[in-house]
Amino acid sequence: MACWEKGGQVIESQLESEYLKKPLEYRVYLPPCYAEQPERRYPVLYLIHGQTYRNDHWLNLGAADLVDRLAATGEMAPFLMVFPYDRDHYISPPENGFGEAIVADLIPAIDTEFRTLPERADRAIGGISRGGNWAVHIGLQHPEIFGALGAHSTPIFSSDTNPEIAKWLEAIPLERLPRIFMDAGENDRWLQYTLIFEDLLNTENIPHEWHLYPGYHDDDYWQAHLEEYLRWYASPWRESH
């Protein structure tokens, strides 16, 4: 089909939220053939950028091009990606209402405007560095919404102490635990803080996938592992969709 050769489309938009002082800006990646297959519905992956970056971070790493290629060859089921912008990137929760805005406002807007599969099994959240903090913070507090979360080179928020995260984990029924993927570079300057969360998951006997690779806390590292990330998120999503 010719539409697979054209690649996907990225749309920029914004919405108002009572949880934020300014509009929430976001980008949406629509996979190849989205317009040409109006009967089809898609899983959604929410991806959050690193601190001091903008919501084109994952796109600049090559996320859209990679999904274009893998979906066109049939190696991966196509899916939507949503990239929200954490404008107040030096403020952590609960003072920063970014997480609440995603859950209360952005997800309903995406499910209304686009042809999504609005079930937790077809929705995942992940992030790089600070963005991974948000993925943990949002994903563990809303296991009814997300079936998977990824934390890439992620030191936890100082406000999300071990007892607080442990409470979230203990409150999740076993059948509602999201799939969890974590990774970091051996020379990551924040590695000791990433290991805090990884150690907690081990202490709580929470199933998760953990990788420690050569590399630093930088774009070269994340770009080198981008395909692994996206394949992991999409692994439960089949072409039957």
Model region roles, listed by residue range:
Residues 1-241:
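Non-catalytic cap/lid and distal C-terminal segments of serine-dependent acyl enzymes
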